[in-house]
């Protein structure tokens, strides 16, 4: 499968995402973030809601020409992982979140070759995902790589070794 074929499939999926779905995903984020400090909670919800809206729009409008082929074994493993997460969703809001996250993470990982969390994403302690040239650095990858439910093992970023 080519990256362009995958992009076309993702565009079709993205066209089925409506503002109501993004709002439902936002409600799930609010529920999921309830244990964060209030300031971080607000930033977390706003950042992810904005990212969902922007990324779905980006997918729908992506006119780039991608020349590569998709790692189909990696994609299958990734989809199996996402299917497992979706099957464990407890609410309709969580299912909306999983549906949107699935489209976006497949797009950024297998078409764009970018990290799951966009450059600039802030983690506790103020550390951020950053880019130098074509390399993406994550401040928490090594600590989160084995966390159940985390997408870190599929992410193209590497651990930021400037962070201890």
From Swiss-Prot:
Q: Which InterPro entries match?
A: DUF2115
Q: Name one Pfam family in it.
A: DUF2115
- What HAMAP family does the record tag this protein with? UPF0305
| Family per record | Belongs to the UPF0305 family.
Descriptive protein name = UPF0305 protein MTH_812
Species of the source: Methanothermobacter thermautotrophicus (strain ATCC 29096 / DSM 1053 / JCM 10044 / NBRC 100330 / Delta H) (Methanobacterium thermoautotrophicum)
């Amino acid at each position: 499968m080519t990256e362009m074929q995958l992009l076309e499939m993702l565009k079709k999926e993205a066209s089925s995402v409506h503002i109501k779905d993004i709002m439902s995903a936002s409600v799930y984020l609010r529920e999921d973030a309830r244990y964060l400090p209030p300031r971080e909670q607000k930033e977390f919800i706003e950042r992810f809601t904005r990212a969902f809206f922007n990324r779905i729009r980006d997918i729908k409008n992506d006119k780039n020409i991608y020349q590569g082929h998709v790692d189909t074994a990696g994609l299958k493993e990734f989809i199996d992982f996402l299917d497992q997460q979706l099957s464990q969703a407890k609410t309709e809001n969580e299912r909306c979140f999983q549906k949107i996250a699935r489209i976006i993470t497949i797009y950024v990982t297998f078409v764009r070759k970018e990290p799951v969390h966009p450059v600039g994403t802030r983690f506790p302690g103020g550390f951020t995902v950053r880019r130098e040239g074509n390399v993406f650095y994550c401040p928490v990858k090594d600590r989160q790589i084995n966390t159940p439910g985390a997408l870190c093992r599929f992410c193209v970023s590497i651990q930021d070794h400037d962070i201890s």
